[in-house]
């Protein structure tokens, strides 16, 4: 393994933008950008999948994936720099999924529908935006909680890029009812308006986080999804109080590190089925890596990479 590949793996600490340097000829870089980003497990699972892919096709032996801590204010100058340095694909997490939209040359149908981007693919005219979060969420819910979105009743907490993708995927997959709430009423209203334009308003209901409507509390087998960043820090409060809901709720926290958040601790207390977002992370990552390589990607290898 050469030095540049060691650097790109960055399994313990992320690079800053100032530390991003041109890669040696023949090397291809991939990375996740976010702020904060230290918690991200993406390098472990992507590099494990790339290692498995290289065993089938040696052309990928010089591909590596890292993580870069990037403030929102630096996104505009960062995107051309990554291409110049030899990066052909990027993932985006908080706070970049919506803010990146005006910086892209094009976006795919899913990203347009969801109003958010989590995957960038370099094309001749610049960065092309895609969204694999919706796919990852649906696959993760099925794998971790045996939840099918069709005919499900779903409550999403959040109004950022991840919440937009989750809400659009639920509606597109024919959920029966979608409730959505957020701390910021302005952002909540904006998301609901976009969703209503795309899917109609019949299945969508929003409400203030502090004022849970009675009807949602009575739903059987409600699926509760945390699409906020609350849970990344040990001191973070629970994004929504579960005590008033039925105990047959299924609770899914998109946060995966730490693996047991305040929300999931509360779900366990009330004996609710629950899971963290690792399964979503893995499935969205596999889809992204397929976009970059045009190859079949091993989900099993990604899980092995995280566990190692």
What role is predicted for each listed range?
Residues 202-274:
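Rossmann-like adenosine-cofactor binding region
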Residues 22-146:
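Phosphate/diphosphate ligand-binding glycine-rich loop within oxidoreductases
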Residues 34-36, 129-134, 141, 145, ...:
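Glycine-rich adenosine-cofactor-binding loop
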Residues 172-177, 270-273:
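Conserved S-adenosyl-L-methionine
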Residues 175-199:
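NAD(P)-binding Rossmann-fold cofactor-contacting core
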Residues 151, 250, 254-308:
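Adenosine-phosphate binding glycine-rich loop
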Residues 1-23, 137:
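Short N-terminal or domain-adjacent regulatory/targeting segments
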């Amino acid at each position: 393994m050469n030095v540049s590949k060691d650097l790109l793996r960055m399994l313990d600490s992320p690079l800053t933008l100032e530390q991003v340097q041109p890669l040696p000829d023949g090397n291809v870089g991939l990375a996740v950008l976010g702020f904060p980003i230290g918690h991200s497990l993406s390098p472990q699972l992507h590099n494990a999948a790339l290692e498995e892919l290289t065993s089938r096709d040696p052309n990928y032996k010089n591909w590596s994936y890292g993580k870069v801590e990037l403030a929102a204010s630096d996104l505009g100058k960062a995107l051309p720099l990554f291409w110049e340095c030899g990066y052909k694909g990027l993932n985006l997490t908080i706070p970049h999924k919506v803010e990146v939209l005006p910086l892209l040359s094009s976006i795919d149908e899913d990203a347009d529908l969801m109003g958010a981007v989590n995957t960038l693919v370099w094309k001749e005219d610049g960065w092309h935006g895609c969204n694999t979060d919706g796919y990852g969420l649906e696959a993760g819910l099925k794998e971790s909680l045996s939840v099918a979105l069709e005919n499900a009743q779903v409550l999403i907490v959040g109004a950022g890029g991840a919440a937009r993708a989750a809400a659009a995927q639920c509606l597109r997959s024919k959920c029966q009812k979608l409730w959505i709430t957020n701390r910021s009423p302005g952002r909540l209203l904006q998301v609901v308006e976009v969703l209503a334009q795309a899917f109609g308003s019949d299945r969508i209901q929003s409400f203030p986080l502090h004022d849970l409507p009675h009807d949602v509390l009575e739903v059987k087998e409600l699926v509760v999804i945390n699409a906020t960043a609350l849970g990344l820090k040990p001191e973070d409060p629970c994004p929504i109080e579960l005590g008033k809901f039925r105990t047959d709720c299924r609770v899914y926290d998109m946060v995966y590190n730490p693996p047991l958040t305040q929300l999931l601790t509360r779900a366990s207390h009330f004996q609710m089925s629950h899971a963290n977002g690792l399964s979503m992370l893995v499935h969205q990552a596999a889809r992204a890596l397929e976009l970059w390589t045009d190859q079949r990607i091993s989900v099993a290898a990604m899980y092995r990479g995280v566990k190692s």
